[in-house]
Amino acid sequence: MAFFRTINFSEPPPSIAGDGVMLRPPQMTDFAEWAALRETSRDFLTPWEPTWPADDLTRSAFRRRIRRYGEDLRTDQGYAFLIIRRSDDALVGGLTLANIRRGVAQAGSLGYWMGLPYARHGYMTAAVRAVIPFAFGTLRLHRIEAACIPTNAGSTRLLENTGFVREGYAREYLCINGIWQDHLLYARLKDGQVS
């Protein structure tokens, strides 16, 4: 039955064009720009992310990350993208569709990060809006889920402005920055209907 099939890409997924942004899979040649942006944005990002390993910004750790993304792609478990500003090809952030669940679920989880110099300029909103047709069309997902810490007003605003609906509250849902944190749970359905 076609409904239960997985997606098999023999190559990386295509680049996705959005309003002023391009989403494309990361590659090793992105390391220097990626590491510099993450380092510059460390204090901005760490309150909202899992604890960074000590070697997180090294070339070898980035290589492992690229390999993991490749394995996730081959097994239809995840799709990673860098967000590139189209006006000058600057790397501004990243976005993933991860934890892809097939069968009767046909769902995945949206994750994202934005570099500090590019925050609050609409790039992430454009990126999320661009990846939604890929998730529902190419990947044939029925549901995209996302979670954010209740005090992360930027993420709450982003999700609500891109059609996600708040569905619940999960206590100590994820270990973020070394602490088990409560999260707001959001989802967007393929048909866009709000129950």
Question: Predicted regions span which residues?
Answer:
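A generic secondary-structure signal
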Residues: R68-D72, F134
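Conserved GNAT-fold acetyl-CoA-binding loop/helix
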Residues: T46-R67
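Short loop/turn motifs at secondary-structure junctions and domain boundaries
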Residues: E71-Q77, F164
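Acyl-donor (CoA/ACP) binding surface of acyl/acetyltransferases
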Residues: M1-E33, L37-P47, A80-S195
